[in-house]
Swiss-Prot record:
A motif ('HIGH' region) lies at residues 50-60. Keywords: Aminoacyl-tRNA synthetase, ATP-binding, Ligase, Nucleotide-binding, Protein biosynthesis. It comes from Caenorhabditis elegans. GO terms for molecular function: aminoacyl-tRNA deacylase activity; ATP binding; leucine-tRNA ligase activity. This is Leucine--tRNA ligase. Disruption phenotype: RNAi-mediated knockdown results in an increase in the expression of gpdh-1 independent of hypertonic stress. ATP binds at residue 721. InterPro entries: aa-tRNA-synth_I_CS, aa-tRNA-synth_Ia, LARS1_ULD, Leu-tRNA-synth_Ia_arc/euk, M/V/L/I-tRNA-synth_anticd-bd, Methionyl/Leucyl_tRNA_Synth, RBD_LARS1, Rossmann-like_a/b/a_fold. It is an enzyme of class 6 (ligase). Its EC number is 6.1.1.4. Gene3D superfamilies: HUPs, Isoleucyl-tRNA Synthetase, Domain 1, Valyl/Leucyl/Isoleucyl-tRNA synthetase, editing domain. Involved in protein synthesis. Catalyzes the specific attachment of an amino acid to its cognate tRNA in a 2 step reaction: the amino acid (AA) is first activated by ATP to form AA-AMP and then transferred to the acceptor end of the tRNA.
């Protein structure tokens, strides 16, 4: 059988286990949870409901796994856990896709016959800076974009999902999407083993009358609280059509939204360029920037010499003149930046002017260090993005630095464009932002690192930009201005507002990418009338901050992201005229958009099962017996706000509403909301605002925790269907099994940085899990056969039990902190490792493992691994015959960790590692010293130091005092060296002092203050003696002697170099041996003669140990005893008695001593008597009764 087939067989076996366990959970309704009356603590965990235009992929699963693992752990903590899971259908993409399918059938027939010579759409280049620092408050406009691959037509996209033409036809009805994908997603999630209460699942939009009613109630409340206003908002707009251009109206640019810039006004100073000299109004070159916080570092501005610019009148009174491209001028005219909406009034004769005619213009740049800067040429500027005017900040923009460097280095280039040296040479990059690892001139540093010599090195410059912009925007700290010391991300919006208030800048918005309407018009961004949530209102911001203050965010980056978003968040359009969703109650021409109906829906989960159980579209009345039209605004207010019952406004019996309110009051608030980090800048912050608005005084309903995670990479590459590096949840389970996939998701990562799902890790997980199951089955067989030891008193046993306690406690802390990668590390990888070590220790002393400890390990391993790998854990739990389900079991109880025992365990482990290294060195001496091959040693001496030598104790005292004086930290080596130099007693140890200090500092980093103790905290000799058999077997030694460094006659060098907890082992020359035959005379026993080398002075126990090592037939469990012949001369020649094989023998005690004389006669001394042995003794090997 091939390796691949063997691996698939393991996966198939795991999948069989998973299927049977899922059926068990289903039959027991394991994850259905209802409000309790007994005071049992609860835990509500939720995940942003996925959008229903496709199957779930591994990225969804990664974020959802954080909720899933938390749910599993909290169940073990004895809480009633609810993990509900809904499905989002609100918004434009589903409707747009359905309409596309309709058009494709109209245009190309059914099934569509698409033209073969279709020219592929040209992909627009996406700048690194655009992706890194664009407005994070905007939601993802199309959730299908990332999943379409290279398909051009919607029909082809649907084909790529494995659908046939007949099936695809159904998707031209947008409602079909709502009924097709949710059941598939539920099936996939059930195969994953998700601990969801599926009774509470629902879909959004007005298709679901209950949820529709809930959203209308929410928006009526928000409007009554004056949180919703009507006014002009930035929208993609078609001037030709005279209306907003939504996705379904676009020939290209689906999913593209508005991108906001700060329009920096660089005033043209005298003397003006000849072409502009006749203009009396103030003239401004207007540059669109995404980073207003960098304006302190302006050294010039750039124009493209060959681009055609336009000079036009700006502002309502036309007292200012702007210079920009005609394209951007057209956009500005729809944003209130010209006198008449939609019309550009050009300066006569300057409708077009080449950039070269404006070069050299003197400018006043807002916030710049230089009073006067100049317009210089840059050849990489494009006229289809921004305004064609680029403000230059060479300290933090690699492009700007490269272009400025070209001009400085190339005089002919300056002369070509009529630039004087004074316009270029005096201007140096200005340090304005400090970035860790890049310094305060980040662009200069990156250009130096990448050896960028010219503005034409596009690839290198793109790499440099990505590094500088990413670190600069998120980690940069301002060095100048009134916001010095603050993070750049925190001051971006504030500086934009300051510049606007002072008339030095204004807001400018254009499409993120080119958008063409179906009428053939290039769209702009225009200010259009819309309903919007006024997140910029000061009072509402303050309330949102109060919600955020006690919130658990699990890491500081998430808190900072939420704080920053709350600070700069402004008005957000909550209405759309196209798509699916709930209609605005007071203006039904509009729909509530997708990021606005999904802010407090977690409250709806608490009652969904009573209203619509069994039908996620709400088409069937649920157990509460309440019809959708009975859930009036007043009814919802009774349930969620506790308003007094009023039968006039609440057309439903109060008892029914009470049942709903009971569920809400028990489950709310959310204990943890987990999501991808991309939702920090929108959904997660909107959640804070809306909870503050709906429950303004009831803080008990505010969310308790928000956890964000990074994106998921697949084999260290971005997931992308177009490149084939993509995997759905269904595919992952099929390839790796559910638990194999789950383990790999846990191992992928926890923070806001991108995590990595690695196929090799998933394959290894399958093998680990399969091997673990087989080992557990083997242990059950050994237990049933009585092959495991009954006691648990040996050193290895005590250490194993102690290490289990330690790792169980550490794993609990990791789960509590939602650090699931660490929980997997301590609760599986390290937990398995201590089992392996224990198994090795037991084998090293020829003893079986302890039955009680082995099964303590198995049970606790299943418990602490169950949140991550619940199927296998449940399977083993049932295999062990445990009561109930493991998903309902309590977290294992542990005894306090015995720190001294832990130190002793490390002492043995580290000592043995050092001893093995010594043996290797002993057996492979350096070639120069090699005169003959060393003899394999059989004896050794271990030297143990109870405390450090006096000079080292003096240094330790110095270090301990310094640690106390410096809040537990040690000073640098220079300071320590000065302190040591002052000690008279240490002067003769000057050369040894600092190496010793360095060793102690390294230990200090690992162990803390305990590394500074001057004596051993444990009895090293006792621990070594208890493990002497293990040490001898590991090193293949016959005899080991333990000596203390304070004994007389110890070599001075050994005394000097041996320190507490680091014993020294020296091998001693081998003593003469003589061979003694040990013969087994037991009847019907497969034991044979064993030739044993005897050393003068060997005890019986030593000889037995040698025999065990020599003969594998003498099993660890056998009890071995030695017997001498009564007649040493004739004993081994006599017939053996069948009835009593040992009638001619006398048993030796363990303390008896073997000797041999000069004539090689072997004898044994027992007490005061001495007996000749001849060359043969007898041994008995019995399996002890349990």
């Amino acid at each position: 059988m091939s390796k691949i087939n063997k691996e698939r067989k393991k996966v198939a076996q795991l999948q069989e286990i998973e299927k049977s366990i899922q059926e068990l959970w289903e039959s027991k309704k394991a994850f259905e949870a209802d409000a309790r009356d007994d005071g049992k603590p609860k835990y509500l965990v939720t995940f942003p409901f996925p959008y229903m235009n496709g199957r779930l992929h591994l990225g969804h699963t990664f974020s959802a796994s954080k909720c899933e693992f938390a749910a599993g752990f909290q169940r073990l903590q004895g809480k009633e856990v609810l993990f509900p899971f809904g499905f989002h259908c609100t918004g434009m993409p589903i409707k747009a896709c359905a309409d596309k399918l309709k058009r494709e059938m109209q245009d190309f027939g059914y099934p569509p016959n698409f033209p073969e010579d279709v020219v592929e759409e040209v992909k627009e280049e996406v700048s690194a800076v655009d992706e890194i620092i664009k407005d994070k408050s905007k939601g993802k406009k199309s959730k299908l974009v990332a999943k379409t691959g290279n398909a051009k037509y919607q029909w082809q996209i649907m084909k790529s999902l494995g659908l046939c033409d007949e099936e695809i036809k159904e998707f031209s009805d947008p409602n079909h999407w709502l009924y097709y994908f949710p059941p598939h997603c539920i099936a996939d999630l059930k195969k994953m083993g998700l601990k969801a209460d599926w009774r509470r699942s629902f879909i959004t939009t007005d298709v679901n009358p209950y949820f529709d009613s809930f959203v209308r109630w929410q928006f009526n409340l928000l409007r009554a609280a004056k949180k919703i206003d009507f006014g002009k908002r930035y929208t993609i707009y078609s001037p030709k059509d005279g209306q907003p251009c939504m996705d379904h109206d676009r020939a290209s640019g689906e999913g593209v939204g508005p991108q906001e810039y700060t329009l920096i006004k660089l005033k043209v100073l005298d003397p003006k360029p000849q072409a502009l000299s006749h203009i009396k109004e103030d003239i401004y070159l207007v540059a669109a920037t995404l980073r207003p916080e960098t304006m302190y570092g302006q050294t010039n501005c750039y124009l493209h010499p060959d681009i055609q610019y336009s000079v036009f009148y700006a502002t309502e009174n036309e007292k200012q003149v702007f210079v920009a491209t005609a394209r951007s001028a057209r956009i500005m005219s729809y944003q209130g930046l010209t006198k008449e909406n939609g019309k550009v009034n050009y300066v006569l004769g300057l409708e077009k002017i080449a950039g070269s005619k404006i070069l050299g213009a003197p400018l006043s740049a807002p916030l710049a260090k230089y009073e006067r800067v100049y317009a210089l040429p840059m050849l990489t500027i494009k006229d289809d993005k921004g305004t064609g005017v680029v403000t230059s900040v060479p300290s933090d923009s690699p492009d700007d630095f490269a272009a400025l460097s070209d001009l400085k280095k190339k005089k002919p280039l300056r002369e070509k464009y009529g630039l004087t040296d004074e316009m270029v040479l005096p201007f140096e990059p200005v340090p304005i932002i400090k970035i860790e690892g890049l310094g305060d001139l980040a662009a200069v540093e990156m250009c130096s690192r990448l050896k960028i010599e010219s503005q034409n090195e596009k690839d290198k410059l793109e790499e440099a930009k990505k590094e500088v912009y990413l670190k600069g925007f998120y980690d940069g700290v301002m060095l100048v201005g009134k916001y010095a010391g603050k993070k750049t991300a925190d001051v971006k919006k504030v500086i934009q507002d300051d510049l606007t208030a002072e008339g030095l800048a204004t807001k400018y918005v254009e499409p993120e990418k080119k958008v063409m309407s179906r009428s053939g018009d290039e769209c702009v961004v225009a200010l259009c009338d819309q309903w919007y949530l006024n997140y910029g209102e000061a009072e509402w911001k303050a309330a949102a901050k109060k919600v955020l203050e006690p919130l658990r965010t699990f890491n500081d980056e998430t808190r900072r992201g939420l704080e920053t978003t709350v600070d700069w968040l402004h008005e957000y359009a909550c209405s759309r005229s196209y798509g699916l969703g709930t209609k605005l109650p007071w203006d039904t021409q509009y729909l509530i958009e997708s990021l606005s109906d999904s802010t407090i829906y977690n409250a709806y989960y608490t009652v969904a099962h009573l209203l619509q159980q069994g039908a996620f579209d709400g088409s069937v009345v649920g157990p509460a017996g309440i019809k959708a039209d009975q859930m009036t605004d007043a009814s919802w207010s009774y349930v969620f706000l506790g308003e007094i019952y009023d039968s006039k406004t609440m057309p439903v019996e109060e008892e029914k509403l009470k049942s709903l309110r009971k569920e809400f009051m028990y489950w709310y608030p959310i204990d943890m909301r987990a999501s991808g980090k991309d939702l920090i800048g929108n959904h997660l912050t909107y959640l804070l605002f809306n909870h503050a608005a709906i429950w303004p005084t009831d803080t008990s309903k505010w969310p308790k925790g928000i956890r964000a995670n990074g994106h998921l990479l697949l084999n260290n590459e971005k997931m992308s269907k177009s490149t084939g590096n993509f995997m759905t949840l269904e595919e992952a389970i099929e390839k790796f099994s559910a638990d194999g996939m789950r383990l790999s998701l846990a191992d992928a990562g926890d923070g806001l940085e991108d995590a990595n799902f690695v196929y090799a890790m998933a394959d290894a997980a399958i093998l680990r899990l399969f091997t673990m199951i087989e080992w557990i089955k083997e242990m059950i067989e050994q237990r049933d056969a009585g092959l495991l030891r009954k006691d648990a008193k040996k050193f290895a046993d005590r250490v194993f039990a102690n290490e289990m306690n330690s790792l169980i406690a550490a794993t609990e802390q990791n789960y509590e902190a939602t650090n699931f990668k660490d929980a997997l590390k301590t609760g599986f990888f390290e937990y398995q490792a201590i089992r392996d070590t224990y198994r090795e220790l037991c084998a090293g002393i020829d003893e079986p493992m302890s039955e009680s400890l082995v099964f303590r390990f198995i049970e606790t391993q299943m418990l602490i691994l169950s949140p991550i790998c619940p199927h296998i854990a449940e399977y083993i739990w049932q295999l062990l015959g445990k009561d109930g389900l493991i998903v309902n079991a309590p977290w294992p109880t542990v005894d306090p960790v015995d720190e001294k025992l832990a130190i002793g365990a490390r002492f043995i482990t580290e000592s043995l590692a050092e001893f093995r290294a010594r043996l290797k060195t002993y057996m492979t001496p350096k070639k120069k010293a090699l005169k003959e091959i060393p003899e394999v040693p059989t004896e050794a001496v271990i030297y143990v130091a109870k405390e450090y030598p006096p000079w080292q104790k003096t240094i330790l005292d110095i270090l301990e005092k310094q640690a106390k004086a410096n809040n537990g930290a040690l000073p640098d080596n220079k300071a320590i060296s000065q302190l040591i130099g002052k000690e008279e007693s240490l002067k003769k140890f000057a050369k040894k002092a600092m190496p010793f200090v360095q060793m102690i500092k390294e230990r200090f980093e690992q162990k803390g203050v305990s590394a500074l103790a001057s004596s051993s905290p444990v009895d090293q000799t006792s621990i070594l003696n208890e493990n002497i058999d293990f040490i001898m077997n590991a090193l293949d030694l016959d005899r080991v002697t333990i000596r203390h460094t304070d004994e007389e006659g110890i070599d001075a060098n050994i005394v000097e170099t041996t320190v507490p907890l680091v014993p020294m082992l020296n091998f001693t020359p081998n003593r003469p041996t003589i061979k003694l035959v040990a013969r087994n005379v037991q009847i019907c026993n497969a034991m044979f003669d064993v030739d044993v080398p005897i050393v003068n002075g060997d005890s019986v126990s030593m000889v037995i140990r040698k025999m065990r090592r020599i003969s594998k037939a003498i099993k660890p469990k056998f009890e071995v005893s030695l017997w001498r012949y009564k007649n040493a001369v004739w004993g081994d020649r006599q017939m053996i008695s069948y009835r009593n094989p040992f009638e001619e023998n006398i048993q030796l005690s363990d303390a008896d001593i073997f000797n041999f004389e000069a004539d090689n006669k072997i004898s044994v001394t027992s007490g005061s008597e001495k007996f000749d042995l001849g060359r043969t003794i007898v041994y008995k090997a019995n399996v002890p009764e349990n």
